[in-house]
Amino acid sequence: MCSMNVLTLKNISYSYHSLREETPALKDISFSVKEGEFLAIVGPSGCGKSTLLSIIAGLLAPESGSIITNSANPAQEKTKIGYMLQKDHLLPYRNIYQNVMLGPEIQKIDTPQVQNYAKELLKEYGLSDVMDKYPDELSGGMRQRVALIRTMVLNPTLLLLDEPFSALDYQTRLYVSADICNRIRKANKTAILITHDLSEAISLADRIIVLSGRPASVKREVPIHLSCKRDDPIVTRTAREFNEYFEILWKELYHEKH
C-alpha cells in the first residue's frame, strides 16, 4: 500500500447550534487516510459519525481544525469525492442507466467516453441486462450496486460510505458488502466506511477508528490483519483473529474503563 496520505484531519471540532443552546458534536479529531486504504469508523449511536463524514465531504465546515488533501487546492479535490448513503436514492422515473449517468449530466461531463465507461461498469457488476429497467424492478442488493456504480462513474479518489448496507437484510448485506468492498479494492480506491456493525467493520476494513460518545473524539485506532482472504464474508468471520478484534472493539465502545 502506498504511504501517501490522501486525507489528513487535524483537530477537527464541530458543534450543533440552536436558539437555546450549543451542543458539542466533535472534539479535536485527528487521523490520516492512506491511498488505497479501506478505513472504518465506529462509535456509539448519535456520536457524530455522519457529521464527521459530511465535514470530510465539504458539506459542513468545521468550527476549528483543518482538512488536508493530497491536492494543492482542496477546492479541486471536492470533485473527486464520492458519497454513498444508507439509502440508494435512485430516482424512480429514471431507468438504471439514466440513474448512473445523473452525476456526469449534472457536472456536464456526460461525454461518449463517460457513457461507455458507465456501460462497462454495469457490465462488470453484472447489471448490463437491467440498464433499461427502473429501480422498483431491482432487489435491494442490485440497487446498492447501482448506487456504487453511480458513484464510481465519476472516478472519485476517495469514497465516503455512510452505512450503505444497513437497509439490506442480513444475508444480502453480508454478500453485497463484501462484493462492493472487493470491487473498491480492485479499483484501488480509498474508502471511509461509517458503520454500527463491528463484524462488518472487521471483515471489510484495513483499519478501524473508534470514536467516543458525544462530543466524539478518537479513542483508539485498530489496524486489522486477517489470516484469510476477504472474498467470502462467512470465511472472513471465521478467521482466528476475528473474535479478538471484536472483543477489543466491544470493550472500547461499551465498557467504561475505571
Where is each model-derived feature located?
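The feature captures the beta-strand-to-loop junction immediately N-terminal to the Walker
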Residues: 42-44
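Helix-to-loop junction immediately C-terminal to a conserved catalytic motif
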Residues: 57
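Conserved ABC transporter NBD signature motif
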Residues: 65-77
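Short helical segment in ABC ATPase nucleotide-binding domains corresponding to the A-loop/adjacent helical element
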Residues: 97-105, 115, 223
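Conserved signature/switch motifs of ABC ATPase nucleotide-binding domains
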Residues: 133-136, 154
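Hydrophobic anchor residue at the start of the ABC signature
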Residues: 148
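Catalytic Walker B motif of ABC-type/P-loop ATPase nucleotide-binding domains
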Residues: 159-162
